[in-house]
Amino acid sequence: KPCPVDIDFGDVTIAMRNLLRKQGKQKFNLGTAAAMTFLTIKDPMFIKGIREVMIRFGYAAQNKLYKLGKSLHLIQDQVAHPPATVHKPAVRTQIINFINKPMPGNLPKRSARALLDIEDDKVIPVIRNPKLSAEESEAVFYFPGCGSERLFSQVGLATQAMLYEVGATTVLPPGYLCCGYPQTSGGHEDKGQRITTDNRVLFHRVANTLNYLDIKTVIVSCGTCMDQLQKYQFERIFPGCRLLDIHEYLMEKGVKLEGVEGTRYMYHDPCHTPMKTYAPLKVTSELMGTKVPLNDRCCGESGTLAVTRPDISTQVRFRKQEELEKGTSELRADGFNGQIKVLTSCPSCLQGLSRFRDDTGEEADYIVVELAKHLLGDNWMADYVSRANTGSIERVLL
């Protein structure tokens, strides 16, 4: 809840981390270092390699350890009664904390850019339906961010697919880019500022190169990116433009489901909510074609928190699980026995919510992915990649 005297403890924490780093007091954490490396690098081969290690092997190994720990009854008591953190936890305790909820599975094997062959950082990808004229197609600039592009690439692809469906011309940044927020919040303000400045210069070059396109909307699919991109002064890059979450944009375009049989939804609003123009519950309910209740509380993933401080993450998840179970009970109060899905609009939250599946039986998904599944069909991803790679991508030299 907000501080009664309006102190932003997020800003205070970032300032403290920067101070500790400058004084040489910041402790090294392997999980944080690995995550920052994955988010910062731009070379496609390195991204592919780290993605393979992290997802194909790392996530799979964590899932096997979770099953082993559960079979040996090492994790049940800790999850049911998470101990308070009063001192530095023992290594054994932290390992159990790290494996007590399974990582998500069935993630796409390749990043969104790799699937579309647009990894070259000297080329600006412009994606549009070739059947539409320039006058019929509104140009938007989509900044996918790390979570929607490198990790949960189905989110970035679903965003592009829905933009394609509503007739938008989608301009993507050249190459893999991070917004700079993770570095800033991790205590490396200088690195975060350098990334922000480099990106702004790059986007000015994009705007000059594509000055024949009248870009009036910048789209994001991540709340953390939204918070950072609000500092980019996009109105100076694309004059008269606005910054919108993909779900807000789709709501404006009249996209909605006509009621999904056998499924009911809850909405988890991220701590870094990306929806700044419209109320998140209004957007979610409009898009899903039915009233969607809010499921409160932090999911406990919080970027790298679940890796760097799994003990605290376990405590946060304990309270979130209570909220999920309460929400499920309310949705089933009238005897409904169909599927319950919890929707979100943050890549980190998608990972965090997916980890409750064995305990609550709920499936977690992104709103835009759920829209793509129902409006474009179960095979929407392969269909979109095929359409995009067959004459829908213009590669403009930067």
Model-derived segments and their meaning:
Residues K1:
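Ferredoxin-like iron-sulfur electron-transfer modules
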Residues V5-D6:
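Short acidic/histidine-rich active-site segments
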Residues G10-L398:
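Iron-sulfur cluster-binding electron-transfer modules in prokaryotic oxidoreductases
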